Amino acid sequence: MTQVTVKELAQVVDTPVERLLLQMRDAGLPHTSAEQVVTDSEKQALLTHLKGSHGDRASEPRKITLQRKTTTTLKVGGSKTVSVEVRKKKTYVKRSPDEIEAERQRELEEQRAAEEAERLKAEEAAARQRAEEEARKAEEAARAKAAQEAAATAGAEPAVVADVAVAEPVAKPAAVEERKKEEPRRVPKRDEDDDRRDRKHTQHRPSVKEKEKVPAPRVAPRSTDEESDGYRRGGRGGKSKLKKRNQHGFQNPTGPIVREVNIGETITVAELAAQMSVKGAEVVKFMFKMGSPVTINQVLDQETAQLVAEELGHKVKLVSENALEEQLAESLKFEGEAVTRAPVVTVMGHVDHGKTSLLDYIRRAKVAAGEAGGITQHIGAYHVETERGMVTFLDTPGHAAFTAMRARGAQATDIVILVVAADDGVMPQTQEAVQHAKAAGVPIVVAVNKIDKPEANPDNIKNGLAALDVIPEEWGGDAPFVPVSAKLGTGVDELLEAVLLQAEVLELKATPSAPGRGVVVESRLDKGRGPVATVLVQDGTLRQGDMVLVGINYGRVRAMLDENGKPIKEAGPSIPVEILGLDGTPDAGDEMTVVADEKKAREVALFRQGKFREVKLARAHAGKLENIFENMGQEEKKTLNIVLKADVRGSLEALQGSLSGLGNDEVQVRVVGGGVGGITESDANLALASNAVLFGFNVRADAGARKIVEAEGLDMRYYNVIYDIIEDVKKALTGMLGSDLRENILGIAEVRDVFRSPKFGAIAGCMVTEGMVHRNRPIRVLRDDVVIFEGELESLRRFKDDVAEVRAGMECGIGVKSYNDVKVGDKIEVFEKVEVARSL
């Protein structure tokens, strides 16, 4: 860049040299002669100086004044108006950079001064705390030293001096009390001003009780002989200290709070959110993001709830739903010597086959002679003594209680006596009894009754029961057949001997020294005594005063009665008793357990009551024909259980044969119960226990059965055409099989030429040889009848027009998605996948 002198610059700006030198000197430049060189930065400095001197900085004013004028009109009655003008004026001053810098420096100095003051304050507080600590230690040391000296002095003085030392402190309080009594006499009279002044000064002072409750803060003692009551007297700092002591505050958590979430087998979304201390909507939103749309009351399984809780950053503790039951089972200790117990026998049979007569004869013959004749049976269970031991009988008419016990898993019966009339043969109710006994897995002793009648035919009984898989011992089976006569008493001893022989084979054991455990046979609500339950003690000993847990009920045994209505104090194994004191009537088949205390009994009972509704709802869907696939999906071979009732024997046998023949290696039909006649309450109980469907062929259900079906949600169907039953069962089995995927070939096109398209790549010019070619369907490319590619038909055109389908004998252009290796001579096969239901 060329050098410019002061003289040349004066010529450029058309200014005399002397004036330019004067202006440059005012601008602070060192130039004094016309020959000196002027640099660009010096030119800029001169220009800035000239602008300032000529007033150009006024374009950036340092002070701005704003004026605002507002005019409003007010009405003053009638047509008169008053104009009100409001003027506002504001001035804004722009500070220079030097002022801003000075302000910032002042703020920094003030901040440093404040920090220094805080530091000094903290040091003073620390020094004060150290002084307090040292003073406290010195005081404790002095107190300990004084105590030691006092102990040493007391030990050295004789007993007389000790008496004087004791008497002196006693005398001092007496003198003090005397002075206190005299002081009120010397108190001068107070006027109202004194009282008002005292109230003003003492209204905020804490009382003695308040001072005892709130301990005074530790401070360095001012003087050793000055007593302090913890209240600051005088000074302006007392009020602020009181406020500071009563201050409350909340600190935000510095990090996420991790909670321990207890998750059972099932948990609702609301319960899960409550355990994590978050809103239920947050959990619902989180599960929506996971791809699981749920509601706030929806029940989650354990795995899903565990995943949600862990994703939200909480610890998970898996809890067993039956934890209380497991703890209860562990607390029950059945320790002691096991002894042989009496068998529990249930007598079953058809109504007219002499079951009641046989029971009456056994009771008359085996109960003590002094009690015979006027016996009143209070409960449906009793025990008799024989020469070979004791036998306990359960009277379960209609088999309702027996089926209910089996449904709840309570094996209350050891042996079943099946009473069959020799002159009548095997009847429908006899078949039901056999089905119940086999389902419970207990041995059967057959009593062929009415053997004294001329028309008796025992061989017919054996043939009929052999058809039900009850094989006599003479034929190589395991069921003893005993001919008896309930009228004459013939064969009763042999029957009891056969029962006791079966009991010896079963090796029934019990521990009398253990806490009582049993099962409920029946229960009722007595008007004068409240809930009364008939309990069969199976193990241990039940005593009066024991706390018992029975199903969802509990209570203390206030009284126990035997089968004759006499009060007893305790009952051993295989003894039936009536107990009083429960808080409700338990169901037949509920398990009775003696627990240690009432707290544990109440806790388990409430837990069972909570689960009762869930179990009932789950069981309501168990027997639905439509839900068979979900209910039995875990089994290797799916089974459809059926309880079948028909009007005549021929129809029943035909249906049983046809239904049993259905099925294959994956599914099967099992007729768990069948008979001739209407659907009874016993059939409904059997279907409930066996998870079966009730079928009635030309028969209907009675009131008791309908009540159970409605209460438990069983599936019951009526038919009058035999083929309808077979067709419905086939459909159910087909639904259990699932479905298959089948491929149908829609059409085949042969590639005649290949074109190139910038959009689709290789386009095959084809002739449809078979069927019909559809767009957006899966295809296969075959070369020499070998599949070389499988994909989707992307483009289908005919004469440059997109078409949905092309029939056989027509030409078309085909674009295959993501495939460009099409050659002349290839075949394109278009197919579809169809879901086909499997059939038997």
Swiss-Prot record:
GO molecular function (one): GTP binding
Annotated segments matching region G4 = 449-452
Instruction: Show the segment(s) annotated as G3.
Output: 395-398
Q: Where is the tr-type G domain?
A: 340-509
Point to the regions of Low complexity compositional bias: 144-155
Q: Which GO terms describe its cellular component?
A: cytoplasm; cytosol
**UniProt xrefs under Pfam families:** EF-G_D2, GTP_EFTU, IF-2, IF2_assoc, IF2_N
Which cell locations does it reside in?
Cytoplasm
Question: Where is the region G5?
Answer: 485-487
Q: Which UniProt keywords apply?
A: Cytoplasm, GTP-binding, Initiation factor, Nucleotide-binding, Protein biosynthesis
Region: Disordered; residue ranges are: 95-155, 173-256
For bias kind Basic residues, which ranges apply?
Answer: 233-247
Primary location group: cytoplasm
BP term (GO), one: translational initiation
Keyword hit for Nucleotide-binding: yes
Q: Region annotation G1: residue ranges?
A: 349-356
Described function: One of the essential components for the initiation of protein synthesis. Protects formylmethionyl-tRNA from spontaneous hydrolysis and promotes its binding to the 30S ribosomal subunits. Also involved in the hydrolysis of GTP during the formation of the 70S ribosomal complex.
What protein name is recorded for this chain?
Answer: Translation initiation factor IF-2
Annotated source species: Pseudomonas aeruginosa (strain ATCC 15692 / DSM 22644 / CIP 104116 / JCM 14847 / LMG 12228 / 1C / PRS 101 / PAO1)
What gene does this protein come from?
infB
